[in-house]
Amino acid sequence: MMSNQTVYQFIAENQNELLQLWTDTLKELSEQESYQLTDQVYENISKEYIDILLLSVKDENAAESQISELALRAVQIGLSMKFLATALAEFWKRLYTKMNDKRLPDQESTELIWQIDRFFSPINTEIFNQYSISWEKTVSLQKIALQELSAPLIPVFENITVMPLVGTIDTERAKRIMENLLNGVVKHRSQVVLIDITGVPVVDTMVAHHIIQASEAVRLVGAKCLLAGIRPEIAQTIVNLGIDLSQVITKNTLQKGIQTALEMTDRKIVSLGE
């Protein structure tokens, strides 16, 4: 059987040519996918992959961190799984072409193909595995960031904070609203919290229930809750559904809500004379 040293030597001897061939292939594939990346990026990816191959031939477990880094980089620059799979398949074609150019005896050529594939296949499998892990982590972080943006608590005056809500409110988002409210009240030492629902399209029984719960939770940590943005259609819906908001201070606009919040903290907005 052909030794690892023979495989290493074959890849090393053809490294520069393989690097150029695969870099050119990546550029061609990127044009089909409309990726806007520099030539240096593709050259770096090609070099990293060939280095991983060479390192793995010496020690099968030595390139684990490099494989993870390559997969993470592919995710970060936006390369799709399809692009990655096609690119790796093209690399094997280029490698096979180089073996044919050597015009090795059939037996020797077969052994070389088998031996290279022994390293090539597990590496590719691990790259796809690490790509999936990196992608899931990235999506998870993006989801957390979006969740934070979906219920931000903003300090507007000393001891007064506003939570502007836009879009529908489901159970999961309601939990985030509650969590951010309670943490924010403590963090900003809020005395009054305004929940602005101007951008909430529908206020049904469930949404109202979540708002009442949030208001009660804010009261329990020593602050007062004020609901702003009660549009006429929402007011009508609340009345028709028999929703009791008597324990919550309500205002039809955020401006009036802020004026009330200032009054509740012994302040007011005044006009300066000329």
From Swiss-Prot:
One function term, GO molecular function aspect: heme binding
Role: Acts as a positive regulator of sigma-B activity in response to salt and heat stress by stimulating the activity of the RsbT kinase toward RsbS in vitro.
Keywords: Phosphoprotein
Gene: rsbRA
Residues spanning the signal sequence: none
Name of this protein: RsbT co-antagonist protein RsbRA
Disruption phenotype: Cells lacking this gene have a decreased response to salt stress, indicating that RsbRA is a positive regulator of sigma-B activity. Its activity is dependent on RsbRB.
Domain STAS: 150-265
PANTHER family for the chain: RSBT ANTAGONIST PROTEIN RSBS-RELATED, RSBT CO-ANTAGONIST PROTEIN RSBRC
InterPro entries membership: Bact_StressResp_Reg, Globin/Proto, RsbRA_N, STAS_dom, STAS_dom_sf
The protein's assembly and partners: Interacts with RsbRB and RsbS in the stressosome. The stressosome probably also contains RsbRC and RsbRD.
